[in-house]
Amino acid sequence: MMQQPPPASNGAATGPGQIPSDQQAYLQQQQSWMMQHQQQQQGQPPAGWNQQSAPSSGQPQQQQYGGGGSQNPGSAGEIRSLWIGDLQPWMDENYLMNVFGLTGEATAAKVIRNKQNGYSEGYGFIEFVNHATAERNLQTYNGAPMPSSEQAFRLNWAQLGAGERRQAEGPEHTVFVGDLAPDVTDHMLTETFKAVYSSVKGAKVVNDRTTGRSKGYGFVRFADESEQIRAMTEMNGQYCSSRPMRTGPAANKKPLTMQPASYQNTQGNSGESDPTNTTIFVGAVDQSVTEDDLKSVFGQFGELVHVKIPAGKRCGFVQYANRACAEQALSVLNGTQLGGQSIRLSWGRSPSNKQTQPDQAQYGGGGGYYGYPPQGYEAYGYAPPPQDPNAYYGGYAGGGYGNYQQPGGYQQQQQ
């Protein structure tokens, strides 16, 4: 069932099922941690784990994550930091450094915490000695079991600040995959498609942020558009693990070099500075795109509270359950293609913010890229869902949209 993570690309040659020698120390400690997990309660560290205390909410938290230091972020080969998600509340910098720092390859770790209460937001960053080391750890551990947890590692390249995002190596073409069996991992899904299509770049199974269990769907990324198109037909109904898959189109990512470096909102980006705001404004929405299409694309980054495309308007709003998910979605999806058109993302209006929403026309000609705030990777709180989610979508009324044949209306599996 492909339980072993892929071997390091530049390590010593190993036979089937063998572990690279430079990972032996880590895996031995992982086994020890896993034995403790049976006594672990949800949200608490395993017995004997030396957890660092959360910083006091009354004092500013010192930034520990280097984010690549003074390197020029324009070259993909120089990025040496990974984003890690789905962290449990007790997983702190000490945990990350014990996992990734045993070989001396990780130089720093940072868990993003809520400014008000000091508790983890569920994600963080790990900095490595160089790009090659970071890439090897990404390929080796992404999708592999996390020590002392039922969850798998969720890793990706760290996104840089606004105007500093690294250039992509090329366009990406994505296939939506539904009806996945509960045991399907990122690695298993990747290998299922890679056995047929050589241009597969990776796959992601979407997990519930609370339980860590699969939601029953995911996404597969291709470098070759023709293989993506073939896969949507040829892989539909094919088995991955114990169930036949259901495939369909998803958003395609264009090269990031085509995007403006920054966009300054003439009315001020109040949504970015509001720590309770979890709403993303989606501009330049194609007429064929439906709310279900937005759910399938934006839902891969976390739990959605509300999705709305106002009738007669070529824009939409996506509200997440927490700020961290919204930040990651805005960072990754801005400028990607949906329904044959590049969407433009910015922070929408918080339910508690009654200021006028910037006119959608401002976004029609090419709104720019909003990454993480220039001052660093901010920590944000959770936004309570509004009593009437449609209340702050007012002012957008008119006709409807056509029917777009995507994996819209996908029903999440009941575990």
UniProtKB/Swiss-Prot annotation:
Residues 23-64 have a biased composition (Low complexity). The keyword Isomerase does not apply. GO terms for molecular function: mRNA binding; poly(A) binding. PROSITE patterns: RRM (PS50102). It is found in: Nucleus. Interacts with the poly(A) tail of mRNA in nucleus. This is Polyadenylate-binding protein RBP45C. It comes from Arabidopsis thaliana (Mouse-ear cress). The gene is RBP45C.
